[in-house]
Amino acid sequence: QSYRPPPSPRNDCLLMRSITQGDHMLIQGVPGCGWGGCLCSEASACTIALLGSLALLFIWYCYRVGTGQVAPATHPQGVPTEEGCPRRTLRGDAINQRLYRSLRDYAKRYSWSGMNRLHKGIRDQAHYQLGERMAIQKPSAFYLPDLPSAPYFPRESQRHDVEILELSFPAILREFEGIARDFEPGAPVPRGWIVNANPGWHSYYLYRQGECIAQNCRSCPWTYRALSALRTFINANCFGNACFNVLQPGTVIPGTYGPTNTRVRCHLGLKVPPGCELVVGGEPQCWSEGYCLLVDDSFLHTTAHNGSPSDGPQVIFIADLWHPNVAGPERQALDYIFAPGR
């Protein structure tokens, strides 16, 4: 028989050649093979489609983060919390939506830069359920996450403002004695004074929830001047107060929580009789006349004047300062979001 050469390879087929590498088998197409080109084209199309889907998913996520809505939060019994005074808890869909709108308005005017913690705090207020669980720290209005906290702060954390207030101690005490001249227990409360929840507890505000009480400031010019010299005094949002605080003997202020962990409350002792005590986060402390005590009042705290009537009242000057770890852009945004009357 005559020799027959092998048939020539066809160009319209796929030559499948297995190349074993470990446990994998690769299928290669011969150049010019139509099926191989089709498979390569299909693989490229799948890759492009996958990348496009991932890009769309990322864009959707960014949109949701920027415009996300907070799920409604309710009272433990299912009743939405009351909207109104910022001292009350900010749980509740309506209030959280208002905070979101305020944050977005601020970011449009200025920038989203540095707003990550604020965004997270507003978004997760309902998740924290601060008003529904027992805790040693439970701010009643706004909680800023990832903020270092302790019941008491060292003097060095607010050295400049502490020194200003302590140097002003004689003038502040003198002005207190002037406004308290007509103050007598049991008598009608003099002008400018406020009776708090406990009848033995009175306050004289120079700033109340971020608003200056002009008449009271005019009555205490040196104290007002000292406040104006402070670098971290909160004077533009509803978390900021400055006042003379008076407790009569036998008065006990039961455990309460402050509205936010973004502030540090500075207590300057003016008159501290025996038997006066402050307990914050389970840690007791005593005031000293002429010296400042820095407190995070978002922790559970109680105040008591256990002295006798002959000891006279306890008098503390209080000024709310920014927490040292709240950054400048965050402070500006909080002033905008929690502006008085907003």
Each language-model region and where it sits:
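Structured beta-strand/turn binding interfaces of compact recognition modules in eukaryotic regulators
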Residues: L247, K271, G281, D296-S298, ...
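Short, low-complexity Ser/Thr-rich regulatory SLiMs
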Residues: V246, L270, H305-G307
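Short beta-strand His + acidic residue motifs that chelate non-heme Fe in jelly-roll/DSBH
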Residues: I253-T256, E277-V279, V295, H301-P309
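Intrinsically disordered, low-complexity basic segments at termini and long loops, enriched
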Residues: Q1-M16
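Conserved metal-binding segment of the jelly-roll/cupin
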Residues: C286-L300
